[in-house]
UniProtKB/Swiss-Prot annotation:
Its cofactor is Zn(2+). GO terms for molecular function: ribonuclease P activity; zinc ion binding. Its main location: cytoplasm. Its EC number is 3.1.26.5. Part of ribonuclease P, a protein complex that generates mature tRNA molecules by cleaving their 5'-ends. It comes from Methanoregula boonei (strain DSM 21154 / JCM 14090 / 6A8). Zn(2+) binds at residues 63, 66, 89, 92. It is found in: Cytoplasm. This is Ribonuclease P protein component 4. It catalyses: Endonucleolytic cleavage of RNA, removing 5'-extranucleotides from tRNA precursor. Pfam families: Rpr2 (PF04032). InterPro entries: RNP4 (IPR016432), Rpr2/Snm1/Rpp21 (IPR007175). The gene is rnp4.
């Protein structure tokens, strides 16, 4: 079965929409964290449907296990180890590790 070709203008629009959803999630988090989680879920759906990667700066702002918007100190714990950073979502207790390169 052949893939349907999408117009080339859809991907930039999807990237822009994802950026808007993450900025809105950041603004509304302290008033209603549930809305922030919903905005992240919508951004992930757009990303999957349009096959657009979520930018690196946004990928670390949500839990990949439960799709919650993460804010350090509020619903996320950050621990720094040798060579990596451990981020724990306090909603689902899932830990994600990110590699950190040392600066000389």
């Amino acid at each position: 079965m052949k893939d349907k070709k999408r117009p080339p203008s859809v991907k930039p629009l999807a990237r822009e929409r994802i950026a808007v959803l993450f900025s809105e999630a950041e603004k509304i988090f302290h008033e209603n964290p549930g809305y922030s989680d919903r905005y992240v879920a919508l951004a992930r759906k757009i990303s999957m449907k349009e096959r657009v990667r979520i930018d690196h700066e946004y990928r670390r702002r949500f839990c990949h296990h439960c799709s919650r918007y993460l804010v350090p100190g509020a619903n996320m714990r950050v621990r720094v180890h040798h060579g990596w950073v451990a981020v724990t979502c306090l909603g689902c207790k899932k830990t994600t590790r990110y590699r950190v390169e040392r600066t000389p």
